[in-house]
């Protein structure tokens, strides 16, 4: 009996010490390659952009945006980097928001080194006098290039 207990104990020790492998991909893409998780450094670019946006440091955003970046708003407007920054500077409304999530995924093309970051925000839009104009959930996608800069951005809006 003692022998069986020792064998059982040894087996349980071996099983409990074996390394657990985790799946780093899921889903599918148009080229039949798996989708894999991206890096924290790409998420950090979006976090830095959000901080600058919240502080109103729109000129500071240039550091995180490639010269040839394109920004596509939920209403169809398309901006270059400078048009994007200028539109933020000239906006007459006030916004408050919660930054609810961000995660990064790699392109399904193994030759591609850009990463996509998805971020979610709940936004309240008000006038300067404090009158609430609307509430919405924004889902944003940022394409982070090999230099760690935003090269493409688009968002969707769900009024709530």
Give the predicted meaning of each segment.
Residues 118, 133-139:
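Short, surface-exposed coil-to-beta transition loops
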Residues 85-130:
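Surface-exposed, charged secondary-structure patches
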Residues 21-23, 137-160:
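Short beta-strand edge/turn micro-motifs at domain boundaries
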Residues 49, 60-62, 69, 84, ...:
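Hydrophobic pocket/interface hotspot
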Residues 13-16:
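C-terminal motif of bacterial Sec signal peptides marking the signal peptidase cleavage site
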Residues 1-4:
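Positively charged n-region of N-terminal signal peptides that target proteins for export
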Residues 18-55, 63:
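Short, low-complexity N-terminal intrinsically disordered segments enriched in polar/charged residues
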Residues 32, 64, 68-79:
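A short gly/proline-enriched turn/hairpin at secondary-structure junctions
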């Amino acid at each position: 009996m003692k022998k069986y207990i020792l064998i059982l104990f040894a087996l349980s020790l071996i099983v409990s010490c074996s390394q657990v492998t985790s799946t780093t991909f899921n889903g599918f893409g148009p080229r039949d390659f798996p989708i894999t998780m991206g890096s924290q450094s790409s998420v950090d670019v979006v976090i830095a952009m959000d901080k600058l946006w919240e502080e109103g440091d729109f000129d500071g955003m240039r550091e995180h945006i490639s010269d040839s970046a394109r920004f596509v708003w939920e209403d169809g407007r398309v901006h270059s980097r400078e048009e994007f920054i200028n539109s933020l500077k000239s906006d007459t409304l006030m916004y408050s928001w919660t930054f609810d999530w961000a995660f990064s995924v790699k392109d399904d093309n193994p030759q591609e080194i850009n990463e996509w970051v998805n971020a979610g925000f709940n936004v309240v839009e008000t006038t300067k006098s404090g009158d609430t104009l609307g509430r919405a959930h924004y889902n944003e996608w940022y394409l982070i290039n090999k230099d760690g800069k935003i090269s493409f951005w688009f968002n969707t809006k769900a009024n709530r």
